Amino acid sequence: MFKVEMGNTANETIIFLHGGGLDHTQWKEVMHHLSERFHCVAVDLPMHGRSVHIPLTMEGTVSHLGELFAQYGQVHVVGLSLGGAITLTALHRFQQYIKSAVISGTTVSLRVEDVKLLNTYVAPVYQVIKPEWMTMLMMKGFKIPSRFKKEINIASQSINVEQVRAMFNVLTEVELPILNQSPLLVVAGEKENNLVKRAQAEITAYVENSEAAIVPKAGHVWSYENPVLFAEVIERWCINQTVHYVLKSV
């Protein structure tokens, strides 16, 4: 998988996994604020960005991540949305490499029956949406600041029916790391939908050593809305597993 690195490799490493339909640039400003203290690595997940040639499956993606973890040794992992779902499964499979993790806006496994309906009736819509329309819809829907328009426009070039179906399929294969020893912070934006908030409650109910928190006034992709706060939340959790004072405990 394609990756971008920032910061001194002698420092502790944080692996960043972006949301569906985005790419590594989602984390650019967050990484900038963390790079003095951490070695930051943002990947392009399969069928996204510069990893568009790699098939997107849960098994394949987590295997790629396992190789990346082994390369760096002990790592922290941060994932948003699709990236958060993959983080959960990676934590289940490769807990020995993960010192701590932060996930945001993540759902747990979707039912196969529901995904069949989504793949039949929702995914084909992406066949007729032009990239420039997708950019506009994403920026408006996620309240992404205008300074990110170029990055969103590039990411939207990869969005198609096959990618969307692959993402839906991946979300049927999430494995919860129930016997978890790595501190896990499960975050949701205050403006997230109920599906995400129910998943947040389910994850923290079943996964040991996990904690939930709400980000006030934040939406789904709040790494764009407030990269400084996102960086501070990550830093506090990675260093001493404390929840940022701005967040509301659940």
Regions found by a protein language model. Name each.
Residues 1-15, 35-39, 70, 143, ...:
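Alpha/beta-hydrolase fold catalytic core
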Residues 5-50:
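Conserved HGGG/HGGXW glycine-rich cap/lid loop of the alpha/beta-hydrolase fold
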Residues 28, 32, 41-78, 232:
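Active-site loop/oxyanion-hole signature of alpha/beta-hydrolase fold enzymes
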Residues 79-83, 87:
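Gly/Ala-rich beta-loop-alpha elbow adjacent to hydrolase catalytic centers
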Residues 88-93, 97-128:
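Flexible "cap/lid" loop of the alpha/beta hydrolase fold
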Residues 112-114, 128-179:
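Conserved alpha/beta-hydrolase catalytic His-Asp/Glu region
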Residues 166-205, 211-214:
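Conserved serine/cysteine hydrolase catalytic core
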Residues 218-231:
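Catalytic histidine-centered segment of alpha/beta-hydrolase-like enzymes
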